[in-house]
Regions:
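Helix-coil-helix junctions within alpha-helical repeat/solenoid scaffolds
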Residues: 1-152
């Protein structure tokens, strides 16, 4: 994947570059290489002033929070994780990006569930999930439903 991104970058195109970096960061995170993933997310968030690239900001912040949580392994970075996830929620809401909002809400709800804040997690996720009227066979909505059932 890294080679493919290098080849793409060599073309001089920067279109969707933050998104591609986010995909690679997520892959690194899945392999436990959180430092590499966080470095890529920092790079992805840097050019967010460019027109057309702001659509990924919510997901970038969510992934940053997820990787920070995976890296921390303890409670010392939880405030930083929560800040990232709240930023993801705020950006998604401002952009009216319901799919990104659902993902951010699920991430924050899972964190709160681990902290014993089950009711807060349920109250956060329920209205976001209820906005959807279709697509209930998608992975995100199935995951949200399962999370809500576990919180109820």
């Amino acid at each position: 994947m890294r080679q493919g991104l290098a080849a793409y970058q060599a073309t001089g195109s920067e279109r969707h570059w933050p998104y591609y970096l986010a995909l690679l960061a997520d892959a690194y995170g899945s392999r436990g290489q959180t430092a590499e993933g966080l470095s890529l997310l920092a790079e992805a968030l840097a050019p967010m002033g460019r027109p057309g690239e702001r659509g990924w900001v919510a997901e970038l912040h969510r992934l940053q929070g997820e990787l920070l949580l995976a890296q921390a392994g303890d409670r010392h970075r939880v405030p930083e994780v929560e800040t990232c996830l709240h930023q993801a929620l705020d950006v998604a809401r401002h952009q009216q990006a319901t799919s990104w909002e659902l993902r951010a809400a699920m991430s924050l709800a899972r964190l709160w569930q681990r902290q014993g804040k089950r009711q807060e997690a349920y109250d956060l996720l329920t209205p976001v999930y209820c906005w959807f009227t279709e697509g209930f066979d998608t992975a995100d909505l199935q995951e949200a439903k399962a999370l809500l059932e576990g919180l109820a």
